[in-house]
C-alpha cells in the first residue's frame, strides 16, 4: 500500500514467476484488497517491456471484481511501456480504467509474438516477430490508434527535479489527486 487507501501493483514483465505464478499473485492481491478496505488500486506498467500478454488475465479478473464493488483502478504507463505491456494497458482501457502518465514507447498496433532460432554457424540466438497485432480489430479501446503510440488518458510527466530528488512525480500526483 502507498497510503491507507491506495494499493499499488508494480507489473514489470509479462511473464510468469515460477516462485509466484500469476494465479497465486492475483489471489494474494484479492485477499489484500478484501482485508484492507482500499478505495483505489494503481497498476504500474511503466517499466514493463512486454512478454506474454495473457499472463495478466487472472489479475484483470480480480480488478474487474474490485471495480464492480466500487474500487477505483488506475493504470500507469510511460516511455518504457512496450509490446505486450501495451496490449495489457489497452485491456485496462477496455475495462474502463483510465491510463495516467506519459506516452508508451511502442504503438498500439505492432509486430509481436517473438519466435527464436540459432544461426547455424555462429550459434547466435535471433528473435523475430512472427505476427502483426492489430488491437483495433480486437479491442474497442484500440480502435483508430493504429501505429500511433499509446497515450495516457491524463498526461503527467516525470520531472527532472522530481527524478533528482528521488520522487515519483506520477505517483505523487495520483496521491494528491485521489
Features from the language model and the residues they span:
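C-terminal "post-core" interaction segments
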Residues: 1-178
Amino acid at each position: 500500500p502507498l497510503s491507507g487507501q491506495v494499493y499499488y501493483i508494480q507489473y514489470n514483465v509479462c511473464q510468469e514467476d515460477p516462485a509466484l505464478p500469476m494465479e497465486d499473485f492475483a489471489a494474494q492481491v484479492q485477499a489484500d484488497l478484501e482485508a484492507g478496505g482500499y478505495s483505489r488500486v494503481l497498476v504500474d506498467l511503466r517499466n514493463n517491456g512486454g512478454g506474454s500478454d495473457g499472463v495478466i488475465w487472472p489479475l484483470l479478473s480480480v480488478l474487474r471484481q474490485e471495480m464492480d464493488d466500487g474500487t477505483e483502478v488506475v493504470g500507469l504507463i510511460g516511455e518504457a511501456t512496450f509490446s505486450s505491456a501495451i496490449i495489457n494497458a489497452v485491456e485496462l482501457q477496455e475495462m474502463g480504467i483510465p491510463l495516467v502518465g506519459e506516452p508508451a514507447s511502442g504503438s498500439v498496433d505492432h509486430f509481436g509474438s517473438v519466435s527464436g532460432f540459432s544461426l547455424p554457424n555462429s550459434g547466435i540466438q535471433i528473435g523475430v516477430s512472427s505476427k502483426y497485432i492489430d488491437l483495433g480489430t480486437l479491442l474497442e479501446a484500440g480502435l483508430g490508434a493504429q501505429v500511433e503510440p499509446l497515450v495516457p488518458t491524463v498526461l503527467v510527466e516525470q520531472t527532472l527535479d522530481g527524478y533528482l530528488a528521488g520522487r515519483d512525480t506520477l505517483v505523487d500526483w495520483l496521491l494528491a489527486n485521489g
